[in-house]
Amino acid sequence: MPLVRLDISHVRNLSSVRFEPSPQVNVIVGKNGSGKTSVLEAIHLLSFGRSFRSHKHKTYIQHENDACIVFAQLHQKQGSPIRVGLQRHRDGQIDVRIQGQRAQSVIELAERLPVQLINPDAFRLLEGSPSIRRQFIDWGAFHFDKDFIQAWRGWQKALKQRNTLLRRGKISLSLLAAFDQELIRLGEQVNQSRKAYVEKLTPHFVKVLSLLTTELSVSLQFFQGWDAQKNLAMAVEAGRERDIELGYTHTGPQRADLRVKTATGDALDTLSRGQQKLVVSALKIAQGQLLIDMGRPLVFLVDDLPAELDANHRQKLCQLLESLNSQIFITSVEPDTTDFTWADTTDVRQFSMTNGELSLLSKGLQES
């Protein structure tokens, strides 16, 4: 659902920012430290309940304030906009509201406001640990399969309990086997959802990458976390003695990974930084496109667009995002790096950010 209105209070240097974004393209220009990225951070916070810049909530709550607040109105095809809000307290408490009523969890916001982030740290999707790529897959599986989150939570709980049991030591194989039934059932469900999602994502990724560049041939390979020739029950049974020795569960969905390959090896090892940026951008856009094809509009956040992409690829990236008919927020230090030829029918709004103050520079459809 596109953001119709956004109110931000006490997020970093944004004491009070209120504005009505375009349902299509929003460009925010400002110097480093001006607060432009904090606008994207606030939108991300409203969707995920956490920042993409820091895991420590106290770092983004404005100094001398007890909490930060992000409020938005979300467009609906029928009826009045939905009012959603999130308040993050300095003590860590999160208060989520939808239509004025307290929500049970941030997940209810994530369902209503899917957000995709493309920023300089997106390289971590290739460079980082498998856990980052699992998060990438799980975000998609969450939106693709309505039963995924319940299975994932149950499996995580069973895995944690099993590892606690293993750390205590002196456990028999028969007791562990009895305990493993729920772990295996839920783990297989999580694995099947992940596998199905990657299969759906792959052709979208290949197509998007080809639109960004014709110079790369990249494939996606899903590793489920154990031998593909075995089911999870067989893998867990074969590994019980080793698990007892190690004191933790060494095989299963918690070891899953998304392997990004070129013809000559891992994409991380064979591609330049600029090419890696294109691959990661294609992965993110493909995820969004798949969601849009399901009738689920989402918001793209593109922070520091010029970073590591030349003007030609920046133009292609923006044209591709524009073609998805999604709401887009783009930040840049220099105005000329986002001075593209948008479609005549695209509502582009340009904002300037100075010391936490946001001002509208231009609004409306592009001139012919």
UniProtKB/Swiss-Prot annotation:
ATP binds at G30, K31, N32, G33, S34, G35, K36, T37. Pfam families: SMC_N. Signal peptide: none annotated. The keyword Cytoplasm applies. GO terms for molecular function: ATP binding; single-stranded DNA binding. It is found in: Cytoplasm. Its main location: cytoplasm. GO terms for biological process: DNA replication; DNA synthesis involved in DNA repair; double-strand break repair; SOS response. The keyword DNA repair applies. Keywords: ATP-binding, Cytoplasm, DNA damage, DNA repair, DNA replication, DNA-binding, Nucleotide-binding, SOS response. Disulfide bonds: none annotated. One of its GO terms (cellular component) is cytoplasm. PANTHER family: DNA REPLICATION AND REPAIR PROTEIN RECF. Belongs to the RecF family. The RecF protein is involved in DNA metabolism; it is required for DNA replication and normal SOS inducibility. RecF binds preferentially to single-stranded, linear DNA. It also seems to bind ATP. NCBIfam families: recf. This is DNA replication and repair protein RecF. It comes from Marinomonas sp. (strain MWYL1). The gene is recF.
